Amino acid sequence: MYVMKQNGWVELICGSMFSGKSEELIRRVRRATYAHINVRVYKPAIDDRYDDKAIVSHDGTSTMARPIHDAVEILEDVDNNVEIVGIDEVQFFDNNVVDVIEELADRGIRVIVAGLDLDFRGEPFEPVPKIMALAESVTKLNAICPICGSPASRTQRLIDGKPASYNDPIILVGASESYEPRCRHHHEVPFRPENNFATKSWDALKS
C-alpha cells in the first residue's frame, strides 16, 4: 500500500455489467461524504434506466448525480471547492472525457471513474482503455457467469433471449432484460471475425 503525497489522481473501476462497478463508486463517494469532503458526481444523460438524476446500482443502492451530455460540462460545473469528482458509465462519453479527467486530476481533484472495459463484442470499449493507462489506481471487478459459475469478465447482449450479432450497434442502454454477465468460454457473439492468428497457431501446434 502506498500513500498519496500530492492531491489529484485518477481511480478507475472497471469490469463487466453486474460486477458491482456503480456500487463501488457509490461506496467511495459515500465514504467521502461522511468525511465532509465536497463531492460532485456525474453520469451520461443517455443512461436513464433507473433514475435520470441518480446513479443506481443493480442492487438498488444510489447516490445523486448530475446528468450531462458532454464531458466538457464537468469542467464548467466544477469549482475550486470540489475535492472529488465521480463519473459513472464513462464508456458512454467520447474520448474528450480523457482530457477532462486529466485536467481535473491536474487541478488537484481526486477523480473516481467507473465503466465497462469491454463492449458486448468482448473488445476494448473506448475510452476506458485510455483511462486505464493514465489512472493511478485500477480496480477490475468480475461478475459471476450464470452458465457455469466462473468469474465473468464479459457482457453478453441478448436480443429476444438470443446472443446479439457482432454487427449490432455498440451502444444500447439496458439492464438485465438486454444483458447478462458471461465468462470467456460462454460469451457468444455471432458473426464475430475469427482470430486467424490464434487459429493458425493452434493448428500448427496440433500438426
Curated annotation (Swiss-Prot):
Catalytic activity of the protein: thymidine + ATP = dTMP + ADP + H(+)
Presence of keyword Cell inner membrane: no
Cellular-component GO terms for this entry: cytosol
Keyword ATP-binding belongs to the record: yes
Residue sites binding ATP per the record: G15, S16, M17, F18, S19, G20, K21, S22, D88, E89, V90, Q91
Entry-linked PROSITE patterns: TK_CELLULAR_TYPE
Positions contributing to Zn(2+) binding: C145, C148, C183, H186
UniProt keyword list: ATP-binding, Cytoplasm, DNA synthesis, Kinase, Metal-binding, Nucleotide-binding, Transferase, Zinc
Protein name: Thymidine kinase
